[in-house]
Curated annotation (Swiss-Prot):
Domain of life: Eukaryota
Record's protein name: Limbin
Recorded name of the encoding gene: EVC2
Keywords: Cell membrane, Cell projection, Coiled coil, Cytoplasm, Cytoskeleton, Dwarfism, Glycoprotein, Membrane, Nucleus, Transmembrane, Transmembrane helix
Cell location: Cell membrane; Cytoplasm, Cytoskeleton, Cilium basal body; Cell projection, Cilium; Cell projection, Cilium membrane
Keyword Cytoplasm attributed: yes
Disease linked to the protein: Defects in EVC2 are the cause of bovine chondrodysplastic dwarfism (BCD). BCD is an autosomal recessive disorder characterized by short limbs, joint abnormalities and ateliosis.
Job of this protein: Component of the EvC complex that positively regulates ciliary Hedgehog (Hh) signaling. Plays a critical role in bone formation and skeletal development. May be involved in early embryonic morphogenesis.
Bilayer-crossing regions: 201-221
GO terms, biological process: smoothened signaling pathway
Topology class, membrane: Single-pass type I membrane protein
Ranges of the Extracellular topological domain: 1-200
Renumbered residue ranges of the record's region Disordered: 689-714
Length: 1209
């Protein structure tokens, strides 16, 4: 049999940790013949902590330079593995070192067999050592031999055997150091080979494998075809439907939900109660993000089902062929697949970009923070050079603590900022996906109209249904979101209550244990003060009491850790099983609803099914979550209380029996001892009652907090607020849309799509507002803290200039800089621990409200800008054409005047030229009037049809079976009329919107007709101008200068286009009138040379005179407007009418935020820059059979005749 020895040697730096020492740490393997267990010592840094009246914690090397270590060397030379353990204490020579007294060393030896030890062993697995005094620079060590039998531990077991050292130094408090010591058992089994057994096993295994191989081959051949065909069908079906219900059938989403729910068990069973609320807040953010993703997936699925349902209804009504429906359905599926791929790629790009940007920002701010710290340390070092070494060490320690807090604050700020950036990226992708879904639908409808697969009337009806259903979808999603927000708020409010409950239980447990242990020490001290014990006896009893108390607490910690670990696994398994079952049930129901959309006849019915299903699912899931959370808390709390009560009972038993017997052995009077025990029993009962009362009070505060949270996120209030906001925005967008003068069908379609896009992003996501609130609160707290830091720095720089507090003594002017620096640093550290002012929360709420209002206003502004831009572009195109036409008429007038004055043409010849165009002008005017009359008659017929439809359907809404003998006939009719009033109003509003849309479309059609007619007229005028320029022998350069004067705003390209048109028309005119005119000779060219030069100045003068006349008229008009009485300005702009700006839940209670309304009519008062927004109460809509009067436009043909008449006269 061989013995192996494994050795690992660690040489840690001596100056970085308290675990460094003068001798090398060695790790040997315990070995035994068979089975063989190997024990490894895992070395870790010594942690330092204080107990009792603690002033601060130590980390790394202790403040007074004391080093405490527990080390071992393993030996394998004996039958059972053994180790030589050494406890080492070194009081090193440092500037802050001091002599140590009353050293008490407590060593955990649970599971070990101790040999050759000088310590006092207890029955609970501890041994104690004492030393009266340890001088600076001295050290002492304790050694003993321990063995571990293989049957005492199992493979993989870990033994935690720390040692503790407490002592008294120059500090008024006792200091306690802890040296961790870990043993891990590994079992190595050596198997002795048996060749006969191996041969028999090989034969049996060979025969069994042969039989199984033939059986598998037989079944593979038998079912190969069936399996192949079914697999092919499954792959095809999966390829077609992988996107249809992926959000509901995917196991990843369920697994993520289960993982998030498991974290609640981790939080409740955490060993650090102080970090529970922070972990719960992070869990809430992650859950809100997951809920946003689920809602977005639900919205996408509903939108796809709605599109398919609309196409099916269109096919069933005979307005769309089944072949076209299938083709459009296939195109929609393909577009949806491409959209999902595009979104995934965009998501990956955003994540990479955001990660790189956040890393760069982190490096920059970390470097900046490091430079500030180095500058502060250098500045402090200049001050510390002139002070004692002890003060310098204390000040440096404070500065390092402050810098650590600043770094932690910076890390949290960067993490919150990165979290906000990710949430905004998710929101942008969600908005992009919604808009792209609308874009896909509208694009396919336009394509179907263009290809002739869908009639315009059917497309118009389809778009109206789509718009109406989208309003219902947005209302449904608002309900889903409000319901989810309410249920999640309720869930995490309850969880916060549970966390506070378990923290209260932990506080109660620790309080009882501390009271019981303090009573044990107090019992001994009272006897010593009464004179029944001398100092040596008291020290021995105190040592034993401290050993027993530490043993009980250590056992409690170990039992809690082990039992919580077992219970944690049990709770996770139970929770996952029930949650997975609930998710499967709800997923089947969701799939059934999605499949039923193909059989649904009405979209409202389909949306109603979704509403009921989601409400039921949310309530059931939250009920299950709450029940599981409460059950987990009850079990964990019962476990904690049972173990703590057991530990407390052991401490009482130790006091009443063990310590009592020891005191009685030393001759303590029984009556005195009994009196003290009864007093302690009463104090412990009173302490327990007081802790229970505090726990009840905290529980009541938690209940009130949960109620207030549910009140803030009430489902009905949130839904009503969102509905009111959408109604308000609907009024604004309707008002903006009605302001359009003319729109084509395509432009109207684009405007509808843009309105849908605006309404699609009017909701509030679940996670982003909360994340944004955390970022704002962190930012405001940072600003507040920096302002306080600035005050402290100013006070340190010039302390005599700062006002003194009445509660404090005035600082002495002779106080040194080091005292001021220490005081300033301590105050800054305290600021990190203090709570920020409560008004910052209200400030955050106000900022969130302002940002939301700005977002809504930005949507309104963008829509109004696009609408105004569209109208301006149309007006600009018409204006450019009018300018060109007017310039052409001006040039014609000049040419005719010069031809007449130069006697090149007689007056009758000019009349003949003008009259030659009169038949063509009259024909154009007749055609235009016929087209206008036809379109207006068509619109009147549509208005009549709409009125007849409303007259037939509107009163029918009120027609119900009546009771002939009813005594309340009138009241019944009125009640029915009131109940149906909303439907009538909606129907009337819909008909009014349709009438307005028809009006603007008709106006655009008439404008196009007039434009076409005007283009034809413009072509004729070009021919006439070309002919006149031919007669006057006008050079091209002169004509270009004339056009430049007449069209000063025209570009060179536009001028060249007019010149080319004049030249081309001149050629056409010369061909048509070949022989009618005689070519001018060189003498006539010289004759006209003189007035060619004066022509430009004459045209410029006429244009200047016209401009002056227009300016004069505009000035008089402005003066007449300013003379009118204007209403006074108001501080807040109010939209007149029954409704005003809706109240938002985040609105601050201190002051109202003025909300300007985009798209209002603004009037400049007295040219001072002040704006008066005027809103008029809309009159009640009236049903009219007449076509709305069109704006009177100037007839260009009549204007042309008048211009000619004026020119001839």
């Amino acid at each position: 049999m061989k013995f192996s020895k494994e050795i690992e040697v660690f040489n840690p730096p001596l100056a970085s940790s308290a675990s460094s020492g003068p001798w090398v740490h060695s790790v040997f393997a315990f070995t035994h013949s068979w089975p063989r267990k190997t024990l490894f010592k895992r070395d870790s840094a010594v942690t330092h902590r204080l107990y009792g009246d603690i002033s601060r914690d130590f980390q790394g090397t202790s403040e007074n330079g004391v080093i405490f270590q527990k080390c071992a060397v393993v030996s394998v030379q004996s039958e059972w593995p053994s180790a030589h353990v050494r406890l080492f204490v070194n009081n090193t020579r440092t500037p802050t070192a001091a002599n140590l007294s009353d050293l008490f060393l407590l060593d955990n030896i649970t599971g070990l067999t101790i040999r050759e030890s000088a310590g006092n062993q207890t029955s609970r697995g501890f041994q104690a050592f004492r030393k009266k005094f340890l001088q600076v620079g001295d050290s002492f060590s304790v050694s003993y031999t321990a063995s571990l039998e293989a049957r005492d531990v199992g493979s993989g077991d870990i033994l935690l055997l720390p040692a503790q050292l407490s002592f008294q130094s120059s500090s008024p408090n006792r200091t306690q150091l802890k040296a961790p010591f870990t043993i891990t058992a590994e079992e190595k089994i050596t198997v002795l080979p048996n060749h006969g057994l191996h041969a028999a096993g090989f034969c049996v295994a060979f025969i069994l494998s042969l039989v199984l191989t033939w059986a598998v081959l037989f079944f593979m051949v038998r079912y190969q075809c069936v399996k192949g065909s079914s697999l092919t069908r499954h792959q095809v079906q999966h390829h077609e439907n992988k996107l249809e219900h992926s959000q509901f059938t995917s196991a990843d989403g369920v697994n993520e939900d289960l993982a998030l729910n498991d974290q609640m068990i981790d939080i409740l069973s955490s060993e650090d109660p102080g970090s529970m609320l922070q972990a719960l807040e992070e869990l809430e953010i992650a859950t809100l993000n997951r809920a946003d993703s689920d809602l977005e997936a639900c919205r996408t699925q509903i939108s796809k089902d709605i599109i398919a349902l609309l196409l099916k209804n269109l096919t069933s009504s005979g307005q769309l062929s089944p072949q076209v429906e299938r083709r459009m359905g296939a195109v929609f599926k393909k577009q949806f697949l491409l959209l999902e791929k595009e979104i995934q790629e965009e998501y990956d790009r955003k994540m990479v970009a955001l990660t790189a940007e956040c890393d760069l920002e982190t490096r920059k701010k970390t470097e900046s923070q490091y430079q500030r710290e180095m500058a502060a340390m250098e500045e402090a070092e200049e001050v510390l050079k002139r002070v004692s070494e002890r003060s310098a060490v204390e000040c440096s320690s404070l500065l390092r603590t402050l810098h650590g807090l600043e770094q932690e604050h910076l890390r949290r700020s960067l993490a919150l900022q990165q979290e906000e950036d990710l949430a905004k990226a998710h929101r942008q992708l969600a908005i992009f996906q919604r808009n792209e879904l609308h874009n896909i639908f509208f694009t396919q409808i336009k394509s179907a109209i263009f290809k002739g697969e869908l009639k315009p009337e059917a497309a118009k009806m389809l778009l109206q249904d789509y718009s109406k259903i989208q309003e219902s979808v947005e209302e449904l999603m608002d309900f889903f979101q409000a319901s989810k927000r309410y249920h999640l708020s309720k869930r995490f409010g309850h969880r916060e209550y549970l966390v506070q409950n378990i923290q209260s239980s932990e506080t109660r447990m620790q309080g009882l244990l501390s009271t019981a242990s303090a009573q044990l020490t107090l019992l001994i001290q009272k006897h010593e003060r009464a004179g029944y014990l001398d100092e040596d006896q008291m020290q021995v009893l105190l040592e034993r009491a401290q050993t027993e108390v530490f043993s009980i607490k250590q056992k409690l910690d170990n039992d809690l850790k082990q039992e919580k670990k077992k219970l944690h696994q049990k709770l996770i398994i139970k929770r996952r099983r029930e949650m997975l079952q609930k998710h499967k049930e709800q997923r089947r129901e969701q799939l059934s609803i999605a499949e039923a959309s193909g059989a649904a006849e009405d979209a409202g019915q389909y949306l109603g099914q979704w509403r009921g299903l989601m409400a039921e699912h949310s309530a059931a899931l939250e009920e299950l979550q709450e029940r599981l959370d409460q059950a987990a808390l009850d079990e964990l709390r019962a476990l904690t209380l049972s173990l703590s009560e057991k530990a407390t009972e052991e401490l009482r038993r130790l006091q009443n029996s063990g310590m009592t017997q020891e005191l009685l052995k030393r001759g303590v009077p029984w009556l005195f001892l009994q009196q003290i025990l009864e007093e302690h029993s009463r104090d412990l009962a009173a302490r327990a009652e007081r802790l229970e009362g505090e726990e009840r009070d905290r529980g009541q505060e938690g209940v009130q907090s949960v109620r207030q949270r549910l009140k803030d996120d009430a489902l009905e209030a949130s839904t009503e607020e969102q509905a009111e906001l959408r109604h308000w925005e609907h009024l604004i967008f309707t008002k903006l849309c009605s302001s359009a003068f003319s729109l084509s069908e395509e432009e109207l379609l684009g405007m509808r799509q843009e309105v849908h896009g605006c309404f699609a992003q009017m909701d509030r996501s679940l996670a982003l507002p909360k994340i944004r609130a955390r970022v704002l609160l962190q930012r405001f707290q940072t600003a507040w803290r920096e302002a306080e830091f600035l005050k402290l720095d100013q006070a340190m720089t010039a302390p005599e200039l700062q006002p003194q507090s009445k509660a404090r003594k005035p600082r002495s002017k002779s106080r040194s800089k080091i005292d001021l620096l220490k005081k300033c640093t301590e105050d800054k550290i305290q600021l990190f621990k203090e709570q920020a002012p409560e008004d910052l929360v209200e400030k955050v709420r106000g900022e969130l409200l302002r940002e939301r209002v700005q977002q809504l206003e930005a949507q309104e502004g963008l829509f109004a800008e696009s609408l105004v831009s569209l109208q301006f572009q149309k007006a600009a195109r018409m204006a450019r054409t009018l300018w060109a036409y007017t310039a052409l008429l001006s040039i014609q007038d000049l040419l005719l005047e010069e031809l007449n004055s130069s006697e090149t043409l007689t007056k009758s010849a000019c009349m003949q030229i003008l009259e030659s165009h009169s038949p063509e002008l009259q024909e154009l005017e007749r055609k235009l009037e016929d087209q206008l009359a036809h379109q207006e008659a068509a619109q009147l017929q549509r208005a009549l049809d709409s009125w007849q439809q409303w007259a037939g359907e509107g009163p029918a809404l009120l027609q119900e079976p009546e009771e002939t003998d009813s005594e309340r006939h009138v009241s019944a009719v009125l009640q029915r009329a009131l109940s149906k009033g909303q439907k009538l109003l909606e129907y009337h509003q819909q008909s009014l919107r349709e009438e307005q849309e028809d009006s603007v479309v008709l106006e655009d059609l008439l404008e196009n007709m007039e434009t076409d007619t005007f283009v034809t007229l413009y072509g004729q005028e070009l021919r006439l101008a070309s002919y006149l320029s031919k007669l006057t022998m006008l050079p091209g350069g002169t004509l270009r200068r004339l056009l430049t004067v007449a069209l000063p705003a025209a570009s060179q390209a536009e001028l060249l286009a007019v010149l080319d048109s004049v030249g081309q028309k001149h050629q056409d005119h010369s061909v048509e009138n070949d022989g009618s005119r005689v070519q001018a000779d060189l003498g006539r060219r010289g004759k006209h040379q003189g007035w060619w030069q004066a022509l430009e100045s004459k045209l410029r003068g006429e244009l200047i005179n016209r401009g002056l006349e227009k300016m004069l008229w505009a000035q008089k008009r402005k003066e007449s407007i300013l003379k009118k009485t204007c209403p006074p300005l108001r501080e807040r702009v109010i939209f007149s009418g029954k409704r005003s700006w809706p109240h938002l839940s985040l609105e601050s209670t201190d002051e109202l935020t003025p909300v300007p309304i985009v798209g209002a009519e603004a009037v400049d008062l007295l040219n001072t820059g002040e704006k008066l927004f005027i809103f008029r109460n809309p009159k009640e809509p009236e049903i009219s059979l007449h076509v709305p009067p069109r704006k009177k436009k100037k007839n260009f043909l009549n204007a042309k005749k008048a211009a000619w008449a004026l020119g001839l006269n």
